[in-house]
């Protein structure tokens, strides 16, 4: 695991949060409280939107190999495997990868799939990927420029990125909630991203 304390803290947080996080996508895996159901409906629609948008782009026949960085509990991974893509799922939380592996195993698909337990910024690949999905990942990236440069090196065709905004109620409550749980969180505005030299 990473020598970076922030990365270790993020991995620890998501390792403990894996089952609950997975239930945001699929409630039948773990029932959600009424409060969480309301929060999901009001403030977490972007999770589903990102998933659908990413899939719509990656359906192309030209996209054969996909790296899902910060794969979480594997919801995008499963959808990509259903599209017969070769998928590499990378995460820093072992429990997230375990949930992903169990979900993939239950599908009984003949596909090329593997998991990698690593900090993306420190992991070197032997191959380039046709597409890289980076959804819900930059929330935990302190240095976005170095990650963006690495993405450009690791992708041969396309990169799908979502970058969290720093405004509104959802951003505010996430800042409070994650600080209480000792999980570093990085939110960005257009202006803050423009300050980085590309």
Give the ranges of each region predicted by the language model:
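Conserved beta-strand signature within the Rossmann-like core of class I S-adenosyl-L-methionine
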Residues: 156-164
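A short, conserved alpha-helix within the catalytic core of class I
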Residues: 141-150
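Short, glycine-/aromatic-enriched active-site segment of Class I SAM-dependent methyltransferases
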Residues: 164-184
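Conserved class I S-adenosyl-L-methionine
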Residues: 2-59
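Class I SAM-dependent methyltransferase SAM/SAH-binding core
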Residues: 75-109, 114-120
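Short alpha-helix
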Residues: 184-198
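Class I SAM-dependent methyltransferase "Motif I" SAM/SAH-binding loop
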Residues: 70-72
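A conserved beta-strand element that flanks and buttresses the S-adenosyl-L-methionine
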Residues: 133
């Amino acid at each position: 695991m990473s020598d970076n304390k922030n990365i270790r803290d993020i991995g620890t947080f998501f390792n403990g949060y894996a089952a609950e996080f997975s239930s945001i996508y699929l409630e039948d895996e773990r029932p959600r409280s009424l409060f969480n159901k309301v929060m999901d409906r009001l403030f977490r629609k972007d999770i589903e939107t990102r998933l659908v948008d990413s899939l719509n782009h990656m359906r192309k026949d030209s996209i054969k190999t996909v790296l899902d960085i910060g794969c979480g509990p594997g919801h995008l991974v499963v959808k990509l495997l259903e599209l017969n893509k070769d998928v590499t799922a990378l995460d820093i939380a072992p429990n997230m990868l375990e949930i992903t592996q169990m979900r993939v195993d239950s599908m009984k698909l003949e596909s090329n799939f593997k998991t990698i337990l690593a900090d993306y910024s420190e992991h070197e690949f032997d191959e380039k990927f046709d597409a890289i999905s980076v959804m819900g990942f930059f929330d935990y990236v302190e240095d976005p420029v170095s990650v963006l440069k690495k993405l450009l090196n690791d992708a041969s065709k396309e990169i799908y990125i979502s970058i969290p905004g720093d405004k509104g109620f959802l951003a505010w409550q996430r800042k409070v909630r994650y600080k209480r749980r000792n999980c570093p969180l990085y939110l960005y505005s257009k202006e803050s991203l423009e300050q980085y030299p590309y």
